């Protein structure tokens, strides 16, 4: 039986189940770069094409002509505060409303090629954490929306001076005398937490980091007044990431570089690698700073949007937790101040801007939004790459990183209208 | 036999590919499969590229083509970059519409080599025999892995490679001779002789002596490709460099037939 030949806009692609599907005529992003290759998918997983050819000795049921587009793993956003009018830090009155908001964002993210994200919650009260966290159970991507990797809790264990838009009255600046007890009191269960951003200079911070790491949580240092020393101790205790590099931290100084100095720290080793989130929206990080980061430690560069509820919305007034944010174009400011809130840039925009600002190849920019964040969270055996056996979550884009179609587990879940 | 002399390796590849296309289209018109014997190596690479171009241009389909490769290393993993499974997959099969159920490559990782070889001969027979066996030759005149001294009546079997071949192959295995396979499964000389047509591609001056021995000297098991002198329908396609050891009169004779030979692949 000969394969059915389809184009990416065929309605069949939204309903494919257990058929053997071959995506051809595409530039596939793999560790060796962008190459003209095919991707084979069945039951939502990527197959080894030689095994299909030489062992199964079968032809594809369906062949999909990708018309020369780039086929990249789906984008992963480790820092997303909300979007499309929904704020993850806002819990109004009931679980259902919150869950519907989360689902709406997840669904809309597919149009941005994002197939996995960490719903990000800024500093909140223990009551809010206890209500929200049980609702953020991790999930895989599907036609229902992008997959939830688990919550990214930004705060409340942060520096009061570097809290940014976080509500001052809820910031907790010490984890003494009993860090574990305090964490459990504030957060409740750590089960649905993927990432915690905290300030490493706080009392009890090192013990807290070790505790989080022992629960499988990724620790990121940020919203911090720390000098380099506490930052290095944090890395040695198991912290693996810096939150939105350059933002909400001490500026670089040649006699004490602060957390920025971690990029070239002698404490970094294969056992203690370091990644850093960076917002390449053209607002949070000056292009020159982007270039400094890229040229200093390109291996650790991970793109995050840090997008807020206004993502995908028009200019106006929006909420971020208990805070009020004013949005104009790509700028979002805390009401009554000149403090920058999260961004309103999409991940494709951040990828494009990184390329434009640094001159990096598209392969690097895409890897910074796919394989690297997956590796950081320890989920690269499922997501963030197109290696054999992985979930077939991918995105078809052109050379300008315009999303043409998004696929989850091999099914088309978004198609751009031309 | 025919000796077709083209200017360079690219022209050799073009002629060979056109010949294969012609044969496929003939078979298709007659409602039959075309059964091809296929080689690996740098010489046939150009032919495979041309065939892929013809496929992409819509000139040809491999839907009604069956293939049997000549040989494969023993105990080299299928997915190793130097295995012939890898060569054929990367350079040809994955780029065309051939049904994988119709391709055959000896399994060098089997525990029973004798049985694998007997099965291979049986499958060739069941397919109705090979219509066109495409081959290359070694500098010593070997065809497939039928190295000097191989019986001209040989069938598909396991073969121990000689020292020269192993040393020559080391460059494909990181220069480490201990990593080079020492044995291979190969179709025999008689297996190739049984094909209805044989097309041998020869390029480069390092093959010139072999071509001379193949067509101007006597038939000998020390130059197994010389067996093609007895084949009822053998074609050699060579570039100018490969003819450097031939007598001038031999070259002139076959060049005089080029207009006729050219007409075989006009489309």
UniProtKB/Swiss-Prot annotation, chain A:
Keyword annotations: Carbohydrate metabolism, Hydrolase, Metal-binding
Residue spans crossing the bilayer: none
Annotated GO MF terms: metal ion binding; N-acetylglucosamine-6-phosphate deacetylase activity
Residues involved in substrate binding: 165-166, 247-248, 255, 281-284, 340-342
Cofactor: a divalent metal cation
Cofactor binding note: Binds 1 divalent metal cation per subunit.
Record-linked InterPro entries: Amidohydro-rel, GlcNAc_6-P_deAcase, Metal-dep_hydrolase_composite, Metal_Hydrolase
EC number: 3.5.1.25
Family statement drawn from the similarity comment of this UniProt entry: Belongs to the metallo-dependent hydrolases superfamily. NagA family.
Entry protein name: N-acetylglucosamine-6-phosphate deacetylase
Organism of derivation: Caenorhabditis elegans
From Swiss-Prot, chain B:
Catalytic activity: alpha-D-glucosamine 6-phosphate + H2O = beta-D-fructose 6-phosphate + NH4(+)
Keywords, sorted A to Z: Carbohydrate metabolism, Cytoplasm, Hydrolase
Any single biological process term in GO: glucosamine catabolic process
Record-annotated membrane-spanning stretches: none
Pathway terms, separated by semicolons: Nucleotide-sugar biosynthesis; UDP-N-acetyl-alpha-D-glucosamine biosynthesis; alpha-D-glucosamine 6-phosphate from D-fructose 6-phosphate: step 1/1
Keyword Hydrolase among UniProt keywords: yes
InterPro entries, sorted: Glc/Gal-6P_isomerase, Glucosamine6P_isomerase, Glucosamine6P_isomerase_CS, NagB/RpiA_transferase-like
Top-level EC class: hydrolase
Active site: 71 (proton acceptor), 140 (for ring-opening step), 142 (proton acceptor), 147 (for ring-opening step)
Sample GO molecular function, one term: glucosamine-6-phosphate deaminase activity
Superkingdom to which the source organism belongs: Eukaryota
Entry's EC annotation: 3.5.99.6
Record Pfam families: Glucosamine_iso
Cellular location(s): Cytoplasm
Chief location bin: cytoplasm
One Gene Ontology cellular component: cytoplasm
NCBIfam families, A to Z: nagB
Family named by the database record: Belongs to the glucosamine/galactosamine-6-phosphate isomerase family.
Function: Catalyzes the reversible conversion of alpha-D-glucosamine 6-phosphate (GlcN-6P) into beta-D-fructose 6-phosphate (Fru-6P) and ammonium ion, a regulatory reaction step in de novo uridine diphosphate-N-acetyl-alpha-D-glucosamine (UDP-GlcNAc) biosynthesis via hexosamine pathway.
Assembly with partners or alone: Homohexamer.
Official protein name in the record: Glucosamine-6-phosphate deaminase
Protein source organism: Caenorhabditis elegans
